[in-house]
């Protein structure tokens, strides 16, 4: 059996880039909670002792940006300079303006347009991907890397591993078998974890705790064997972390947010963007389309692309590739997709309920992935029933 290796990585909520994603989405949530028609393009950057939020926001909401920044940093665990940022004493800079009137009239017609007439907020192309290798219909390498990161945060916050600090990265290499275009995981080849820690803990204690409390509960035993390689804090020391260790920026972790390197990516980031930004809403609807194709048995693995022009409601193109795993030809799958999914931005917003913010709805997406999550707020993960007829064999 010929196999190959494929690797995906993830980062924790305390990674400086992910901190920025979460602040941007916390701002989006706050705006949408008070004004569902808010137009938000919120970027965040961070470095030692400083967080800046900047961008274009048009909203009726009354939002305390500084409070959102401090609350988000504090919740993640940035409560002192020692851990990389002090939420209560860091500098917070805010530079937010209104959306450009040129963009507003082109996309929304200054709110005179009906939902089906609302144009795309920008040009671009987005991809959705699904694979039958996990219950989530997501790639195993990505699922495991993501869950290891989430578990690191869990054992830090519940006190299981009190030496942990907020920043950290994970990476998983899976050995795969290609079954006529479908991906079949055989085993986990390598697990890599680099986590921020305090001064008191030894490297041996770190390795033992990570194996027992992080890897064991996450990686199914059937994928581990005596040949699996573990790299646990291979650099030897990771005390300085968060924005103190590295600068952070919104939109720098787009592969971690999506499919871990599988499928394809159009390049647009998600966090801090309201649903008129097709970078986000377009990517959500094509994930629902790809997932529905696989869940309905039309294919074992599939990618869907959609593309847009600024100000134009209808997509310029829709593309489906089942990697040779389709039960019917791809052009017929494409026809089913076009009949069942409305790719106009205003209709995506309604059908996936994307104007509903608050209750950390979009903040939740900003760490540990936007796809494959079992949470009713992730409306794009709901499988649509697709009618099709199996060919007579």
From Swiss-Prot:
Protein's UniProt keywords contain Cytoplasm: yes
Amino-acid positions noted as binding Mg(2+) in the UniProt annotation, renumbered to this chain: 9
Record: residues binding K(+): 43
InterPro entries: ADOMET_SYNTHASE_CS, S-AdoMet_synt_C, S-AdoMet_synt_central, S-AdoMet_synt_N, S-AdoMet_synthetase, S-AdoMet_synthetase_sfam
Keywords: ATP-binding, Cobalt, Cytoplasm, Magnesium, Metal-binding, Nucleotide-binding, One-carbon metabolism, Potassium, Transferase
Cofactor: Mn(2+); Mg(2+); Co(2+); K(+)
Record localization: Cytoplasm
UniProt cross-references to Pfam families, sorted A to Z: S-AdoMet_synt_C, S-AdoMet_synt_M, S-AdoMet_synt_N
Record's keyword annotation contains ATP-binding: yes
GO cellular component, one term: cytoplasm
Pathway in which this enzyme or protein is active: Amino-acid biosynthesis; S-adenosyl-L-methionine biosynthesis; S-adenosyl-L-methionine from L-methionine: step 1/1
Textual note on the cofactor: Binds 2 divalent ions per subunit. The metal ions interact primarily with the substrate. Can utilize magnesium, manganese or cobalt (in vitro).
GO terms, biological process: one-carbon metabolic process; S-adenosylmethionine biosynthetic process
GO MF entries: ATP binding; metal ion binding; methionine adenosyltransferase activity
Sites where the protein binds L-methionine: 56, 99, 246, 277
PROSITE patterns: ADOMET_SYNTHASE_1 (PS00376), ADOMET_SYNTHASE_2 (PS00377)
Family: Belongs to the AdoMet synthase family.
PANTHER family: S-ADENOSYLMETHIONINE SYNTHETASE
Protein task: Catalyzes the formation of S-adenosylmethionine from methionine and ATP. The reaction comprises two steps that are both catalyzed by the same enzyme: formation of S-adenosylmethionine (AdoMet) and triphosphate, and subsequent hydrolysis of the triphosphate.
NCBIfam families for the chain: metK
Description of how the protein assembles with itself and partners: Homotetramer.
Name of the protein described by the UniProt record: S-adenosylmethionine synthase 2
Gene giving rise to this polypeptide: SAMS2
